[in-house]
Amino acid sequence: MPRSGRFSIKAKNYFLTYPKCDLTKENALSQITNLQTPTNKLFIKICRELHENGEPHLHILIQFEGKYNCTNQRFFDLVSPTRSAHFHPNIQGAKSSSDVKSYIDKDGDVLEWGTFQIDGRSARGGQQTANDAYAKAINAGSKSQALDVIKELAPRDYVLHFHNINSNLDKVFQVPPAPYVSPFLSSSFDQVPDELEHWVSENVMDAAARPWRPVSIVIEGDSRTGKTTWARSLGPHNYLCGHLDLSQKVYSNNAWYNVIDDVDPHYLKHFKEFMGAQRDWQSNTKYGKPIQIKGGIPTIFLCNPGPQSSFKEYLDEEKNQALKNWATKNAIFVTIHQPLFADTNQNTTSHRQEEASEA
């Protein structure tokens, strides 16, 4: 117990205010980090603020590893590097480091050092309620920032309910799949059979013009014939290659059509839903909640010849006779025997695009 009149503050978190202090944040940080203390500094946040009369102030939050007993009221004094001037702060122990951190964040002109330390008082944040914490998270600019807010203001929820929080924030801050940009102009595909061109004109279009039950198409042909690049050049689409990922990060319900590329038909989940352009169906995921698929769009199935790839060979299997009868009513089957482009056309287009990107 200190004697009456003796200066003493013992705390893990210190809140310092320097009135009429014209030091830069960087200079103040350098001086604070060089102060020798028996317990390590873990986090420092500095805010430079201009009051209405134009005078600059500095607010500083310091978090120590353990409680630091300050008995020298001049210990945190700062000095000007350019003139004979000392800056003496108001020194307080910060009961809620989150409240102080939020307060000095308000003007935005801040500088941080170290890692902010979350504790029980920070979680309560003074009068901070759970609703306030989650409201601040929703208003954050990104999922990572929202997680940081919840970790700081609601650490119990962060630890006990992280899976649900993480999943929900994926939806709140959903980033639509980046639109595909074809490396070739559509005009470079100058060897496309009329059957394919006709199918595109009847089925690949936006929702307003699309048939209620569009027809899908299976295109079989050798590798390097341009099947994939042609199929992906027709408009906004979902591209599923090797396996099906219907998560929101990959699959968009606003696409005009699907492209399913190089998926063994023996293991193709939702065969009928895709080929039949079915509407409003669900896909059950192994570790998550069912995904609702809007559907109603055609699918281009791309495959090579062979028993583990060809849809025709798969449907010709005796056990799949009923499925074959259904498939022929919901899709057309086209086999291509030559590239969908002339070599010179593709090369010329590629060179032109490279030149345009370099210009």
Swiss-Prot record:
Domain of life: Viruses
EC number in record: 2.7.7.-, 3.1.21.-
Binding-site list for a divalent metal cation: 49, 57, 59, 107
Motif RCR-3: where in chain: 103-106
SUPFAM superfamilies per record: Origin of replication-binding domain, RBD-like
Location relative to the cell: Host nucleus
Catalytic residues as annotated in Swiss-Prot or TrEMBL: 103 (for dna cleavage activity)
Oligomerization: region residues: 156-176
Motif RCR-1: chain residues: 15-18
UniProt GO BP: DNA replication
Names of the cofactor(s): Mg(2+); Mn(2+)
Any Gene Ontology CC annotation: host cell nucleus
Keywords carried by this UniProt record: ATP-binding, Covalent protein-DNA linkage, DNA replication, DNA-binding, Endonuclease, Helicase, Host nucleus, Host-virus interaction, Hydrolase, Metal-binding, Multifunctional enzyme, Nuclease, Nucleotide-binding, Nucleotidyltransferase, Transferase
GO function terms (MF aspect): ATP binding; DNA binding; endodeoxyribonuclease activity, producing 5'-phosphomonoesters; helicase activity; metal ion binding; nucleotidyltransferase activity; structural molecule activity
Known function: Essential for the replication of viral ssDNA. The closed circular ssDNA genome is first converted to a superhelical dsDNA. Rep binds a specific region at the genome origin of replication. It introduces an endonucleolytic nick within the conserved sequence 5'-TAATATTAC-3' in the intergenic region of the genome present in all geminiviruses, thereby initiating the rolling circle replication (RCR). Following cleavage, binds covalently to the 5'-phosphate of DNA as a tyrosyl ester. The cleavage gives rise to a free 3'-OH that serves as a primer for the cellular DNA polymerase.
The protein, known as: Replication-associated protein
Organism this protein belongs to: Tomato yellow leaf curl Sardinia virus (TYLCSV)
Classification of source organism: Viruses, Monodnaviria, Shotokuvirae, Cressdnaviricota, Repensiviricetes
